[in-house]
Amino acid sequence: MLDWVHRNGKILLAIRPIQAFAASFVSISFAIYLKTLGLSISQIGLILTGGMISSTLFNLGAGFLEARLGRRKLLVFFGLLSASAGLVFSTSVNTSILIGAAILASIGYRGGFGAAQMLERVILAQSCEDSRRTELYAIRNTVGSLATATGSLFTGLLVLLASWGYSEAGAYRVMFGIFTALNLVLVFLYILLDEEAEIKLEETKQVVLGPETKRYLVLISVLFSMDALGGAFITQSLVAYWLFERFGLAMDKIGMIFSASSLLAAASFMAAARISKRIGLINTMVFSHLPASIMMAAIPYMPTLGTSMFLYLGRSLLSQMDVPTRQSYTMAIVKPEERARFQSLLNLPRSFTLAIGPSIAGYLMQFIGIGTPFLVAGVIKAVYDVLLWVTFKDIKPPEEEK
């Protein structure tokens, strides 16, 4: 099974569900936990923004330092950083210290925007043949999404801990302790990666991006920054807060909604790999993502929880098809030796717009309307979809040119 995947690729596939499980239950409970400490939603948005700025700097640094320090050492460092932040959250009640740890380690975000995941995707790209690259990314995202679903349900432990006599804050600290332990497991698995994970000797010279790659970098950066800005308005932490405030849902119910969302996303990942072989990567990205963007914009106008969740879950089934296809496409159109540098530079403007989004969303939720971020996100993402198709529909990856 998976005999076409290099050993390092298999290790990274084992890492992904642990990583996703831990990030899922923390990101769902993060904003609500900070609210119990007395912070407003606009302040929480600023903390999320600070975390993404920190992640952006680490992302950029990893792209430039991977050849000098090694990918494995960087991955171990990022794993220890997350574990340390989790330890702080599980032991401290000092708000200032918690905010510092959250910003430094980007606690509260779920997804593939961290420096560790950027390095993992680069290693994965060299763990199989080009013809199966999209399939490998789809498998990685599928196991991650299934683990995210499980992690979402795991937030129900908060309710169980409360029934056992734990205080509200004490229950949250137990969850962060589990987050710490899981990140230490990730560190151990990163250590198992072999030399093939590193940049090849002939690639260790200063990488200079070619003219065509630079052109792709500018175009994709602008477009992906738009998509990231839209996504930043609806992070899992902020959606959980919206469900908590708008409908008064308990954490176990919120966890069930996110679990269902992740299961639908998991189904879409493998479908994306199959569909992309028939209609191409760009067409798969746009034709699935555009309807999802329209659904997102309509969510706050739904009169009941049921109708809102019908659209939210429908969006989950469609919107994530662009994840493995996007990851595969951006690896395919550049040379192997350019990939890490390209990805780190590509993520820089994207991470910036992702960083400012939660602050704006928090302001909109507090002062304009709690559902406003859904509308803004949907409109931005729909414009992105159209521009992406117009710009890149004729630029094919190698496997589509054969």
Label every model-predicted segment:
Residues 73-88, 283-298, 378:
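Structural signature of the two symmetry-related core transmembrane helices
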